């Protein structure tokens, strides 16, 4: 069955080959201050 992982590969996996990476949000959520500034900008003509 291809759905089940090969247990020998899992038990013999070398974690030292993994590298640390710095993750960065591609589309971060706006802060409350940013939302308030945008709302104030929309209300003025």
Swiss-Prot record:
GO molecular function, one term: actin monomer binding
Region (Disordered) residue spans: 1-45
Subcellular compartments: Cytoplasm, Cytoskeleton
PROSITE patterns, sorted: THYMOSIN_B4 (PS00500)
InterPro entries membership: Beta-thymosin, Beta-thymosin_sf
Gene Ontology cellular-component annotations: cytoplasm; cytoskeleton
Gene3D superfamilies per the UniProt record, alphabetical: Single helix bin (1.20.5.520)
Subcellular location, principal: cytoplasm
Function: Plays an important role in the organization of the cytoskeleton. Binds to and sequesters actin monomers (G actin) and therefore inhibits actin polymerization.
Designated name of the protein: Thymosin beta
Organism: Danio rerio (Zebrafish)
Gene (name only): tmsb
């Amino acid at each position: 069955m291809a759905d089940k992982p090969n247990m020998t590969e899992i038990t013999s996996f070398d974690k030292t080959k993994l590298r640390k990476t710095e993750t960065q949000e591609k589309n971060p959520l706006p802060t409350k201050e940013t939302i308030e500034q945008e709302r104030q900008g929309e209300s003025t003509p």
